Regions:
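Short gly/pro/ser/thr-enriched loop/turn and capping motifs at secondary-structure boundaries
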Residues: 45-47, 73, 135-138, 208-210
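Short, basic, helix/turn surface patches
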Residues: 66-67, 73, 93-94, 152-166, ...
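General beta-strand structural signal in soluble alpha/beta enzymes
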Residues: 40-41, 67, 102-104, 130-133, ...
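Class I S-adenosyl-L-methionine
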Residues: 1-21, 26-127, 214, 219-220, ...
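Short, well-ordered beta-strand core segments
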Residues: 37-38, 147, 175, 230
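A contiguous loop/helix-start segment that scaffolds small-molecule binding in enzyme catalytic cores
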Residues: 11, 100, 169-233
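Class I SAM-dependent methyltransferase SAM-binding "motif I" and its flanking Rossmann-like core
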Residues: 106-171, 221
């Protein structure tokens, strides 16, 4: 896309951390307060969790709010359609020279919807900037009082959803299973089969309302929400 020499807005991806508003960085607050347009994922029920966290740490009065809708379907075509639609919603503001900040849970580079939009808009010539945030699994480790890795110990970040981690569970070193809620019963079976329940720690909704902390899974908690992270030392 040709934009000639006209001024274009910048598309910022801003990590707001896992839930505790005190974990927003100074840079995240500055960028959120400076941008006239704020975008954020919105659920089917109307919740904008990332934006709600940001509101508790930054002054967002008078901003244009732009809800973005993303499908939970595993169908790749539907996912790509949602990404294009979200990019279409952001583009007019950037084209008009307005900066847009997209609030993202955790860190903007880890399982982030921002990156899909960034790829689309950057290819069209729009400037894009990523503002890192505190990753959810770092907050979970702190909540559990555990080290994630030391010395030469490898650290693996694995998706807990979809088809599950499978054989990657047997990789050497520490493992982080992110967004494990939907696959939780199956993951419990895998951990029990390996006799790992006692050493697995889990936090559900870290820093958010309804937070639950389990220093081990030997009691087999019955339910687990979408924002669930399991750590295996």
């Amino acid at each position: 896309m040709e934009h000639s020499k006209k001024h274009l807005g910048t598309f910022y991806g801003v990590g707001v951390g896992p839930g505790d508003p005190e974990l927003l960085t100074l840079k995240a607050v500055r960028v959120l307060e400076a941008c006239p347009v704020l975008a954020a994922p919105q659920t089917a029920s109307g919740e904008m969790t990332a934006l709600n966290i940001a509101r508790q740490a930054a002054d967002l009065e008078g901003k244009t709010l732009l809800p973005l809708y993303f499908t939970m379907s595993r169908d790749r075509a539907k996912q790509q359609e949602a990404h294009r639609a979200a990019a279409d919603a952001v583009r007019p503001y950037l084209d008009a020279g307005q900066d847009v900040a997209m609030a993202i849970l955790g860190d903007v580079s880890i399982f982030s919807t921002y990156c899909y939009l960034m790829d689309i808009l950057k290819a069209e010539g729009f400037p894009c900037v990523m503002v890192p945030g505190v990753p959810s699994f770092c907050a979970v480790a702190a909540r559990l009082g555990r080290s994630l890795t030391e010395a030469n110990t490898p650290l693996h970040i694995l998706p807990g959803g979809g088809e599950g981690p499978g054989e990657t569970l047997d990789l050497p070193g520490s493992k982080i299973l992110m967004k494990s809620g939907k696959n939780y019963p199956r993951l419990l079976e895998e951990l029990e089969r390996r006799d790992w329940l006692d050493r697995a720690g889990m936090v559900e909704n870290c820093g958010l309302p309804g937070e639950r902390v389990f220093s081990s899974l030997k009691e087999k908690p019955e339910s687990s929400g979408y924002f669930t992270t399991i750590i295996l030392p």
